[in-house]
Amino acid sequence: MTNQGRNAIDTLLAESLKELTIKQPIEKITIKEITDKAGVIRPTFYNHFQDKYELLEWIIRTELLEPVKPLIQNGMIDQALIIIFAGIEKEKDFYTKAS
């Protein structure tokens, strides 16, 4: 599988988890629910992530941390934090219930 295909599936699984988390606590969400919503089979999930918590970590790293990495490397911590908090605010329902 190409890196682009892998990222597309990762993103699809992430969106599924985010939608499900808004409706119920992450502890109660099953891998089957995530894969059903994403339209993939369970083995596909496990080819990408060990569990839903690794998927959650991927979401945080991809959506909040990686975009600000250049800012942090250049000592622009204040700007990085503003962007991180704006991202959390944008999806506050998800981040509130995912914690």
Which residues fall in each region the model found?
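Residues in soluble alpha-helical coiled-coils and helical-bundle/repeat scaffolds
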Residues: 50-54, 72, 89, 93
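Basic, helix-initiating cap at the start of DNA-binding domains
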Residues: 1-24, 28, 33
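Alpha-helical structural segments
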Residues: 11-19, 23, 37, 54-73, ...
